[in-house]
Design a protein with these regions (language model features):
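Accessory DNA-binding and partner-docking regions appended to nucleic-acid-acting proteins
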Residues: 1-78
C-alpha cells in the first residue's frame, strides 16, 4: 500500500505527537522530529520493530512511543 506520502496520515501523526508532547509538557519536536514523521508517513511501519528501524528513532523512543504510533498507522493501512 506504499506509494508516496499520505498527507492525512502525516497530519494524524502530528496530532498524536502533540498529544504525547503535551502530556509531558515537552516541545513536539522532542518527541519526534518532522523529518521522522515524514518518514513514518511514507514507510508506514505496522510493528514496533519496524518503527524502531526508522532513521531518528532510537531504542528509547521505540519503547516509549512505538505502541501509540504503530496503532495509529495500522488504522490508516487497513
Amino acid at each position: 500500500a506504499a506509494g508516496g506520502e499520505s498527507e492525512d496520515l502525516f497530519e494524524a501523526l502530528r496530532g498524536l505527537r502533540k498529544q504525547l508532547a503535551d502530556q509531558e509538557a515537552l516541545p513536539a519536536y522532542i518527541v519526534l522530529s518532522d523529518k521522522v514523521l515524514h518518514l513514518l508517513s511514507i514507510s508506514r511501519p505496522t510493528t514496533i520493530e519496524e518503527f524502531g528501524e526508522i532513521s531518528g528513532i532510537g531504542d528509547y523512543k521505540k519503547k516509549k512511543y512505538g505502541k501509540d504510533f504503530v496503532k495509529l498507522i495500522r488504522q490508516f493501512v487497513e
